[in-house]
Amino acid sequence: MKRLLFMLLATQLSSCQNKEAQNQPTEKKQTKGVQTSQTEKFKYQATGNCPVGYPVEIYRGGFESSDGGYVDLQAGTHTGIAGWGHVGGGMSTLVKTVPNRLHVQWVAYAEECVYEIDTEIDYEKMVQYFKEGYQNSGAFLNYGEYKMETYTAIVVGYAPGGAVFIWLNGSGKQVEIGRYQGKKVIIPQEEIDKLDGFEKLMLQKSECERIMNNPKIVPPDVMEANRDKSIPFDLWDSYRQKYSWRPTFIVQHDGNAFNARLNMFNAEFEGLFGESLSKNEFVKRAIPKQIQISWRDKDLQNYGGSLWFDENEIFAAFAEVYKDRPEGKAEIELRINVTNTFVTAWVIGNGKEVGINLKTKVEVFKSRLKR
């Protein structure tokens, strides 16, 4: 259902931040000299997302492709409760042409305005990622060989200030395609006049207030945390800062880690296992929001653990470690205690070591399986 909200009352509402449109694609992925016809097809779902506390809704628009294809991105109100960059509501998963353009108008409820974006997006990069796929630790072929999988969703994230982010999502990996910038628009009165009664009702300022005060859309703890605070427009761009780092694991008494998943603040995630964990190379990544690990002791008893890092604590640790050497390298060292019941974390590199344990939430469990 289209919801335009409050443009009808534009003179009564505060205007949202009006940034100049500037598209900022992620670092270009090497295409190895292969140029595509821009009509490549893959099976995927197109979905939307937003940060929690800043709900949005698509008024109209979607993905466009060079062969005339179109994928509508209207899917109701996006709440972001599942997490930034998470696969949200969208159309069915079907074989479709990979889009080369995004044209959308969306309502930013927290800002009481409408944004529009009409921009080319990185088609070549998406096609190469779709073709390359990735190895998923949960999928095996015969003889223990890991199965290659590919991405199954294109996720569009709408952040305050008109910032738009696009990711490719799969069950085992999510990668950013690019960051783009929308601009504030006013919907023409003649267009509003053609809307039906229910849609006109949705244009009232009272609807904006209802959305922002609905605990199923904006959780009460988020409402309270955001109360009387200005919108941090640059926050989601700050999440994109990348550093060269890798996780390392210390398991007591000849134990070893055999699987890890890294969930970053910029909504990218990846798995480390088998050869990728054995090599464990330094990679430019965003700062991690969560790390999940699996390990076994010398008796082949399996354990699992998750660490959720406090945003302020881990960002401060990275700032300290990379302060003098922004292009340096560091490790996030996870130390598992002797009884396999707790994990501590340290950012180590460039001659510095900073603990990130005061506010980190840790959960550890013992598996019923041995191997």
Residue ranges and their predicted role:
Residues 22-51, 220-245:
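Extracellular ectodomain segments of secreted/surface proteins
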Residues 2-7:
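Sec-dependent signal peptide recognition
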Residues 17-19:
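Bacterial signal peptide processing site
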Residues 278-371:
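Hydrophilic extracytoplasmic domains
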Residues 152-258, 334-371:
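Activation corresponds to long, low-complexity, non-globular regions
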Residues 59-108, 257-309:
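Tryptophan-paired
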Residues 121-166, 314-329:
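Low-complexity, Pro/Ser/Thr- and charge-rich linker/hinge segments at domain boundaries
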Residues 12-15:
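C-terminal motif of bacterial Sec signal peptides marking the signal peptidase cleavage site
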